[in-house]
Amino acid sequence: YWSDMNKKLISTIVNLDNFVLKNRMVNATLVAMQQTLPLLAICVYVQLMSHLILSPNALLVTLFNWHLRIPADIQLQEMLSLLEVFVLMILSASFTKHFLSMRKIAQTTLPTLTNFLGTYFLFLGKGQTPTYDTSQYLLVILLSFISCESFYFYQKFVSGDNPQPFAVRFLIWAALILLIDVALHFAIQR
């Protein structure tokens, strides 16, 4: 009895795993995460060094009563924030390129550039140095997915065969996506 139940459970898990891995969104996310992993590792190590040594209330500074004078602490925090946003921008661009390639779209330059810039507009504001967590990666993937699907359907139903990649109708689409990202920026920052 237990062996039959275990076989059914394992078979169900394998089928579910195969279904998830064949999903375009999951596959593009995995490829994008693999491509951004080296940059993400650098970002994590730089953040770790900052929190252990470089910030005024760092762990090692507090434990050993060091009196380090970091003249550009605010600029360092802004640079770390920019590095985090840059990782998110690369993730968005990589996801867009791979997802649209799986959808058999040859001209991916404009949507990739649009999502790259959209991520920048979404997360950076004038004079702000926000901190991010892993939910930001999910938000970037979700917004990139919605943008990619809108581009796919816009190209398929509006432009027809052999579209020019930077035609006015696609530039209007890109401007609309960027305006949505800017509006979401203000909604998130409230």
Where in the sequence are the language-model features?
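Hydrophobic alpha-helical transmembrane segments of multi-pass membrane transport/permease proteins
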Residues: 37-49
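Membrane-helix interface motif
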Residues: 48-60, 185-190
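Solvent-exposed, non-transmembrane amphipathic alpha-helical segments
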Residues: 49, 53, 65, 115-116
